[in-house]
Regions:
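Conserved helicase motor core of SF1/SF2 NTP-dependent helicases
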Residues: 1-213
Length: 213
C-alpha cells in the first residue's frame, strides 16, 4: 500500500478482506498523515494511520535514509527536526546548483523566508482561508523566478488552504504581469494534493501564522 501513512486504518485493512496474507505498507509517518475533519473521528483515534500505530507499538520500519531530491543545504532542517539528523544526501551541491540569476539572500543556501504583514481572511466558501497580501507577493516572486530562467513547468506553489490555492490561481490569471498562458503551466496545489511529488523550485504560501516556530 503506497502512501500508507495518508490512509486511515479501515482503508489499509481492506486488502485483508480479499485474502491478502502479507501487506507491505510504504509511507512516512513523519510526513503528512490522514486528513480528518470530523472531531468524533479524531476522538476515536482514526486520525492515526495503521503505519504509525504499528510504529508506536514497537514495530520498526525499514527507513530509506538517502535523499536524492533536495539541495544538500535544504536537507539540514528536515533531517534534524524529523529524522534525528540521520538523513544522508545522494546528490551534491553541484548536482542541485541553481543556474539562473535569481537574487537569493545567500546563494549557498537556495531558500529564504519572506515576512509579510497581511492578515488571513475567511474564503468565500466559508470553510477555508486566504491571504491577499501573500498571494500578491507570491506573484512577484513567481515573476522574478521566471525572469531568472526558471521554467514554469519546474515551478510549484503549495499552500495548506484550498481558499488560498483558488485565490492564487485567479490572481495569477488576472493580475500577473506576464502572459496568462505562462501561469497556467505553474502547478498550484494543496499540501496533500502535492504529497509525494517534486518540482525544481517550490513556493510555500503559509497564509496564517502564530507565535510558535
Amino acid at each position: 500500500i503506497d502512501e500508507a501513512t495518508q490512509a486511515i486504518e479501515p482503508e489499509c485493512l481492506l486488502p485483508f478482506l480479499h485474502g491478502a496474507k502479507q501487506v507491505i505498507l510504504v509511507g512516512d509517518h513523519r510526513q503528512l498523515g490522514p486528513v480528518i475533519t470530523c472531531r468524533e473521528t479524531k476522538a476515536a483515534g482514526l486520525d492515526k494511520s495503521l503505519f504509525e500505530r504499528l510504529v508506536c507499538m514497537g514495530i520498526r520500519p525499514v527507513r530509506l535514509q538517502v535523499q536524492y531530491r533536495m539541495h544538500p543545504e535544504l536537507t539540514v532542517f528536515p533531517s534534524n527536526t524529523f529524522y534525528e539528523g540521520t538523513l544522508q544526501n545522494g546528490v551534491t551541491i553541484s548536482d542541485r546548483q541553481f543556474e539562473g540569476d535569481f537574487p537569493w539572500p545567500n546563494k549557498a543556501k537556495p531558500m529564504f523566508f519572506f515576512n509579510l504583514l497581511g492578515a488571513e481572511e475567511i474564503s468565500a466558501s466559508g470553510t477555508s482561508f486566504l491571504n491577499r497580501t501573500e498571494a500578491a507577493q507570491v506573484e512577484k516572486i513567481v515573476n522574478a523566478l521566471l525572469k531568472s530562467g526558471v521554467k514554469a513547468t519546474d515551478l510549484g506553489i503549495i499552500t495548506p488552504y484550498k481558499g488560498q490555492r483558488a485565490y492564487i490561481v485567479n490572481y495569477l490569471a488576472k493580475n500577473g504581469q506576464l502572459n496568462p498562458e505562462i501561469y497556467k503551466a505553474i502547478e498550484v496545489a494543496s499540501v496533500d494534493g502535492f504529497q509525494g511529488r517534486e518540482k525544481e523550485v517550490i513556493i510555500f504560501s503559509a497564509v496564517r501564522s502564530n507565535d510558535k516556530v
